[in-house]
Every structure is written in C-alpha cells, then in structure tokens.
Amino acid sequence: MEYNLNNAISYHYGKFPPTNLQISDFLPELLAATDALARFDQMLKNIPNNEILLAPLRNQEAVLSSRIEGTLSTMDEIMAYQADDEGQVKASSQVRTDVIETILYQRALKNAQQALADGYPFSISFIKQMHQQLLFLGRGASKSPGKFKEEQNFLADKIRKEVLFIPISPEKLGDGLDNLFQYIEKSKDAVLIKTALTHVEFEALHPFNDGNGRIGRMLITLLLWKEGLLSQPHFYISGYFEEHREEYIQAMRLVSKENSWEQWIRFFLKAVEEQAKNNLSIAESIRSLYEKLKLEFAAKLSSKWSMNALDFLFTYPVFRNNKFTQNAGIPAPSAATLSKKLIELGYLAEKEAASGSRPALLSFEPLMELVRV
C-alpha cells in the first residue's frame, strides 16, 4: 500500500534562518525561561556533590527522549543494565533492544559533551560521530550509523499511511547543514532563540535515516551549555516534549507549512521554562531526601561509614551487592554488614536474588520512587 501525500508538508527551502524576528515579541517568555534555567543551574552549582542529582536526571532524559521515538524502556531496566555494565555496551539476548538503544543515547550525549569540552566545534563531522555512537547497536545498526541519507526520507503516520512531512532532499542536505552550522557559529540571537531555531531546523533537515529526533534533542543541551547559558551540560528537556508530544510535533510542522517561526519559539521557551521548573523540583526532592536520610542513616546504622553508604546509593541506586562492597569506599566486612542492615530496614529491595557466583541485584527504593518515569 502506498502512502498518501495529500496532506504532506515539505521543507521550507530558503527560509532559514528567519530574517524578520523581533526579540521584543518574545521578551516575557524569554525572560521567564532564562530565569527558570538560571535557578536550576544555580542550585546545581551550590551543591558540592551534584552527581547525586544529575545521575537520575540523566537516566530520565535518556528514557524519555528515546520514548518519543517509540523506544520503550524503564528507569529500572536502564539502571539494572548499568549495574552489570563494565564500560562497554554490548548486545545480549538477555537485554531488550530498547534498553540497549537508551543506554547508547546516554553514551552518545556524554561523548559529545566531552568532545565539545576538548574544543571540537559543532560541525558535520561532529553530528556524524554522535549518530554513529547512537546507532552503534540495536535496530539502528542497520540504518547507516554516521552516514547521511542518500534517498528522500519522510515522516509519516504509519497506521493511516499518510506522509506528514517531507524533509530537505539529499541533494540539498549539504547546503542546509552548512547553513545551520554557520548560523550556530555566527548568529548573535539570544541563546535560547538560537537553540530553538537550531533544534527545529535540524529536525526539518532530518539528515539521517534514523535517530534524528534524539540527536536534535541532544543539541539543545549541548548548545545551552556551550553558549554559556548553563555552567554544566546538564539540562534535559525531553520530559516536556514527551508530555506534549502532539503540540511539539505540530509546532515544528507549522514552521514549514506557514513559516510560523514565532509559534515554535514560544512553544520552545515555554518548554524550557516548565522543564527547568520541573527539573528543579525533582532535584530539590532528591536533595531533601538526601538530607533526611543523612540523619536517619547516622542514627540507624550507627556506623562511621554511613555517609559513604548514602553517597553510593544516591549515585548507583540499582547495583549488584558486590559493587557496594567493592566501590563504596567501605572496608569489605563493614560494607557487608551495612548492606544486610539496609535490607532489613527496608531501604534496599532485592530485585534479583543471588544465584551461584552472581550477587543479588538491589534497588534503593526511596530514590527510585522519586525518579521513575
């Protein structure tokens, strides 16, 4: 059955970047988004060990950004995989493909952040490297990782067999990407405006056969950090996009259909504001839990190693019991005693019982209950 093209919207040739935008038109939304983002960033700067907040937020972002594209994994699955991960992502008959793809999202984003920190510029080779890492394994491995499309692609409603959007043609893609990266390098637009336009333009170019949405959302975090709006590359926006998926897609389509850059920018600024507030709320909840349990652990564990245990659990809330013994910075006999006591007190739940030489898989439920999505 062929796809229906009657309602298809085509790429906006010759209209990027828009030339008639007035920042005054977006000033209230821009100020609100900037303020919310600054509050979140300031809180992270004020916490000595902010990894206890960032690790759960990173996992949420990977799960939700992948979920927008139809890759369904859970926080528990991701963290269980990480508990057995020795630094290499490997395909396994014991692990669902969706989990592998979500883990690869995390790795690609982390490596991209490091590349930018090392002085690598936003460029064609940069996004190709990101894409190659994103689609290294799983279903994407058969979709030309690191290579641009050579045939016309399109976005479609597969149930109704309707084409919704036709991205830029392969023949024009090189010029489109050059134009985008020149804009990123030279534009004097406000950072949030630049980020909004970069994201929607990348989505409209749709340069790869698969993984475009995930790469496009990574660019948001990377740009906000690289352009100086964030002190660290740790702002994750996919939660809002996933919750408002139809509005997100429609706002992007209207850019090409009606040249409606303004509507897209307003949607994006609202997304940043609301997601920053939500991230701040989650981080505050995690910090409050940490402070509460600091007192409880000191009182109930009666051990000089209680803070070591707490920091480990917040950083690795799902783990094999032997990793706690090896990596919490606690002498092995004391670690074994603390682990047993934490289970007895109900802080740790056994997700998998020990079997042979394989240690038990444990979950730090007070934190997991806050961050599951």
Regions found by a protein language model. Name each.
Residues 1-373:
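FIC/Doc superfamily catalytic core
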